[in-house]
Regions:
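Internal gly/pro-rich beta-alpha loop/helix module
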Residues: 188
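Eukaryote-biased recognition of intrinsically disordered, low-complexity regulatory segments
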Residues: 1-11
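Fe-S ferredoxin-like electron-transfer domains
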Residues: 48-49, 57-185, 194, 199-203
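N-terminal cofactor/phosphate-binding cores enriched in small/glycine residues
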Residues: 14-67
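ABC nucleotide-binding domain "signature motif"
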Residues: 6, 52, 201
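Short glycine-rich loop/turn motifs that provide flexible caps or phosphate-binding loops at active sites
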Residues: 9, 17, 44, 169-171, ...
């Protein structure tokens, strides 16, 4: 496969011509914040947190192919501002606190918040007191907590290749994942649980 040379944050990187900026960065140990990326899934660009700056223009790195001589900045004043807006919207709609969450620690949302330097005081201000949404524990293999879900759709896209037992119901801020309980076609592979980047899906 043809190779191209580009620079990411000043570091010269050689990548396959068919790869994306995100993949090139990921393969070279360069962190770009993300919530909806999983290595064996087609990039969806849903979270948009992986935005970078290319020659002064902001692009979504998981959907933008590399080019010869490309100059990429994973952080810039504009990228940081837009990324902070996106993550603060997520935090504001993320009902649950991190304390006591079984997903705390490896949580991709926590990692991104730390990268953008959103501290606990800011989190408390962003999260208004909301009525907790009921957990879905109808599936015999795992529980789904919509209060922790960031709608990355990794579970949906993973299951599409196996049983298509997951869907999205509702729109906008009322959207949530649906697993259909005992009537589901779920085969208990639990790939959705393993791949959840937050604590929304937990094995029973």
């Amino acid at each position: 496969m043809d190779k191209v040379t580009l620079k990411i944050d000043g570091l010269e990187v050689v990548a396959d011509k068919e790869t994306t900026i995100f993949q090139a960065a990921h393969h070279n140990g360069i962190y770009i914040p993300h919530l909806c990326f999983y290595p064996d899934l087609m990039a969806s660009g849903i979270c948009r947190l992986c935005m970078v700056e290319v020659d002064g223009k902001v692009v979504i790195s998981c959907r933008t192919p590399v080019e010869q001589g490309m100059g990429v900045r994973t952080r810039s004043p504009e990228v940081d501002k837009l990324r902070r807006i996106l993550i603060e919207i997520l935090v504001a709609n993320h009902h649950s606190t991190c304390r006591g969450c079984p997903g705390s620690g490896p949580c991709a949302l926590q990692k991104t918040m730390g990268y953008i330097c959103i501290d606990r005081g800011r989190v408390r201000k962003l999260r208004p007191t909301k009525e907790e949404l009921p957990e879905d524990n109808l599936n015999p293999f795992f529980n789904y907590d919509p209060n922790k879900c960031v709608l990355c759709k990794i579970c949906l896209h993973t299951c599409e290749r196996i049983q298509s037992a997951i869907n999205v119901v509702g729109r906008g801020c009322n959207a949530k994942m649906a697993f259909f309980g005992d009537s589901s076609k779920c085969e208990s592979c639990k790939e959705c649980v393993v791949r959840c980047p937050v604590g929304a899906l937990m094995e029973t």
